[in-house]
Design a protein with these regions (language model features):
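Alpha-helical transmembrane segments and membrane-interface helix-loop junctions
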Residues: 1-159
């Protein structure tokens, strides 16, 4: 067995490392979201509500969703119809997989492009409860996660 087959090098090694990086990002977002919501609940319980905690929690949940989608792309964990695909011949299955990958890549290239074009428009807007944080930072998750998903899908396409 070669080093590339064991996940230690080459494209498979890169994909495994890429997946681990996204796992760390998703885990960190989950920990921060948990801590932030817990902090908000504690402060509310003692009668000193934080005005920003629900808005930040919403942003963190959105980020978790987008970065989690990128992680799911790396792990091939999105919902599919394997029974239908498995009923096809190997050649038809391969062709269908390639077409599906290309459609997903095209969609996320479009989403990333549109998401990036919106960022300058949002540069002057900010979170309501934290005006120091521009909406462009909040919404940057869209083009960033689109690029991450395109990378993941391209890794599977060349596999």
């Amino acid at each position: 067995m070669s080093e590339a087959d064991e996940g230690g090098g080459g494209l498979r090694g890169f994909r495994n490392g890429y997946g681990r990086l996204l796992e760390v990002v998703v885990a960190a977002l989950m920990i921060v979201l948990f801590a932030e919501v817990t902090l908000g609940v504690v402060f509310r319980a003692i009668g000193r509500s934080l005005i920003w905690y629900d808005e930040v929690a919403s942003v963190l949940l959105a980020w978790l969703t987008f970065y989690g989608a990128a992680l799911a792309s790396v792990k091939r964990a999105h919902i599919g119809c394997p029974e239908v695909v498995d009923a096809l011949s190997w050649r038809a299955r391969r062709a269908l997989n390639i077409v599906a990958e290309l459609l997903v890549i095209a969609f996320f290239v479009l989403l990333g492009g549109v998401g990036a074009s919106v960022l300058p428009v949002l540069a002057t807007d900010a979170l309501v409860s934290l005006p120091e944080i521009p909406m462009s930072v909040v919404q940057s998750v869209i083009p960033i996660s689109a690029v991450l998903i395109v990378i993941a899908e391209m890794l599977h396409l060349v596999d």
